[in-house]
Amino acid sequence: AWSVQAMPSVCTKESDYFCIRFVDVSSDGQTTVRGMVLDHLVHGIGAQDDPMTMYTDHAAALDHLAMNLVPNAAFSAFLIGGGTYSIPRKWQMLFPEAQVTIAEIDPSVTQAAQDSFWYDPTQDTIVHQDARRFLNETQDRYDIVIVDAFTDIAVP
């Protein structure tokens, strides 16, 4: 007979918001490429030694759109949703003078990005609260705002 205790958890980490799971997606077994699954959907893919590549069409489109809108290398950006933090990680390499703020409601997702997706938060500002509330309360203004928060197929 099966028991709940005998069943291994499918979550790498269970947070207050998500079942967070990591999946190795390396095609050659040599390069470390990993996906982050939140509940049932891949929310990002990152490579240890290649922060410049966006591995999903979604991330590539958001990055490309933002890069066409930046007024200069010292732009300010507000990202709603962190996931693997692939875009901020790339921007840290390209635009070290940019002021990037990320609203990620789940601190466990941010910790997972740091521990397993090679994200260094020291250059950015991270806000662990609902982005709508933060934007309503802050006096800060941003050159770019990217909405990349979703749960499975719904935007909050």
Please provide the spans of the model-predicted regions:
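Basic, ligand-binding patches in group-transfer machinery
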Residues: 1-39
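The AdoMet/dcAdoMet-binding core of the Class I SAM-like
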Residues: 53-156
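A broad, structure-centric signal for solvent-exposed, well-ordered loop/edge residues
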Residues: 29, 43-45, 134
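Acidic/histidine-rich helix-loop elements
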Residues: 40-52, 154
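Glycine-centered flexibility motif
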Residues: 15-18, 44-47, 82, 131
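Generic detector of short, locally flexible boundary/turn motifs and exposed helical patches
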Residues: 2-3, 40-45, 65-67, 144-147
